[in-house]
Curated annotation (Swiss-Prot):
Homodimer. The lineage of its organism: Bacteria, Bacillati, Cyanobacteriota, Cyanophyceae, Gloeobacterales. GO terms for cellular component: cytosol. Its EC number is 2.4.2.18. Keywords: Amino-acid biosynthesis, Aromatic amino acid biosynthesis, Glycosyltransferase, Magnesium, Metal-binding, Transferase, Tryptophan biosynthesis. Mg(2+) 1 binds at residues 97, 231. It catalyses: N-(5-phospho-beta-D-ribosyl)anthranilate + diphosphate = 5-phospho-alpha-D-ribose 1-diphosphate + anthranilate. Catalyzes the transfer of the phosphoribosyl group of 5-phosphorylribose-1-pyrophosphate (PRPP) to anthranilate to yield N-(5'-phosphoribosyl)-anthranilate (PRA). Its cofactor is Mg(2+). Anthranilate 1 binds at residue 85. GO terms for molecular function: anthranilate phosphoribosyltransferase activity; magnesium ion binding. Belongs to the anthranilate phosphoribosyltransferase family. This is Anthranilate phosphoribosyltransferase.
Length: 342
């Protein structure tokens, strides 16, 4: 058990601008999960460990601790993709990464989508999928079975990380982004081999990429899009960091180079849960607007490249466009809904 004096020393360390050691970060997460951190001190620590000043070492150590507490269960599949990002860009777009998960699955890539209800966006992935009929509160064995039967499964984060309830009240009272907003995409219990991970601020691209590498992701892309989007963007260039060709390297992606039309953020706007569900349905059926469809095509291309299912960006765009045109992604969504209700 971590005593209060030790916790205060960690707070003083972080307030002084120093990063926590990986061991200290692990111990702090264990104390949080055990409910051993007093509320006032917990709030102070969450403020001190500011997301935009966090290190990859702190992220990886906390993520490993969370994943171990959840009971990580690697599938053994040679390729398993997650499209979970940080959310939190505050732009109110429709659920792009959720759409991408179904398109990638329809392209033949096994997908384990980790997600939760809305935190800082209008509608979270869990909200929109539940509205469409996806059963969120399934036993773990059924969640895993869906992956084999359908090719895609959804892991409702609160059901896999119940220990996080200990810090939920403090997070709600603070009402700001904290380290826990960054940990969600890193702690999928099925341990994906590949990931495309959108972040809400450009300064998060490098530390999140390094954290993924420390956690053993075989292939990944971390992205921050033009206009502030936590996805690849049609509004401007997207900053990328990935390990697809060896060590992590950064680059910039321009949608026009892939034959995709520029579009304002307003063209990607979502609404309430019913509106977002309707947009998701139409996009997956191949009936979305040009901007809606092309932002999903662009981000699916990123997912396919990250998973090694496309030889390059243009090949990924072509695969995603063809898949979306025949409505196969909606058939995947319907299959997941049916599986959860049988």
């Amino acid at each position: 058990m971590m005593n209060e004096k030790h916790l205060q020393s960690l707070l003083i360390c972080r307030l002084g601008g120093a990063a926590l050691s990986e061991e200290a970060a692990r111990e702090l997460m264990e104390a949080w999960l055990a409910g051993e951190v007093p509320a006032a001190l917990s709030g102070a620590l969450l403020v001190a460990i500011a997301p935009l000043a966090i290190t990859a070492g702190e992220l990886a150590a906390m993520a490993k601790t969370l994943q171990e507490a959840a009971g990580a269960a690697p599938t053994g599949l040679p390729v398993l993709l997650d499209t979970c990002g940080t959310g939190g860009d505050g732009l109110g777009t429709f659920n792009i990464s959720t759409a991408v998960a179904f398109v990638a699955a329809a392209c033949g890539v096994p997908v384990a989508k980790h997600g939760a209800r809305s935190a800082s966006s209008r509608v979270g992935s869990a909200d929109v999928l539940e509205h469409l009929g996806v059963h969120l509160s399934q036993e773990r064995a059924r969640v895993r079975a869906a992956l084999d039967a359908v090719g895609i499964t959804f892991l409702f984060a609160p059901g896999w990380h119940p220990a996080l309830k200990a810090v939920a009240p403090v997070r709600r009272e603070l009402g700001i982004r904290t380290v826990f907003n960054l940990l969600g995409p890193l702690v999928n219990p099925l341990v994906p081999t590949a990931q495309v991970l959108g972040v809400y601020h450009p300064s998060l691209v490098a530390p999140m990429a390094e954290a993924l590498e420390r956690l053993g992701r075989e292939r990944f892309l971390v992205v921050h899009g033009g206009g502030g989007l936590d996805e690849c963007s049609l509004t401007g260039p997207t900053a990328l960091a990935g390990n697809l060709s060896g060590p992590i390297c950064g680059s910039r992606l321009h949608p026009e180079e892939l034959g995709l039309a520029a579009a304002p953020l307003e063209a990607l706007a979502g609404g309430d849960v019913a509106e977002n569900a309707d947009i998701l349905r139409r996009v997956l059926q191949g009936k979305g607007s040009r901007a809606q469809s092309e932002v999903v095509i662009l981000n699916t291309a990123a997912a396919l490249v990250a998973a090694g299912a496309a030889a390059g960006w243009m090949a990924g765009v072509t695969l995603a466009r063809d898949c979306l045109a025949d409505g196969a992604p909606w058939a995947k969504c319907e299959a997941l809904i049916r599986f959860g209700n049988t």
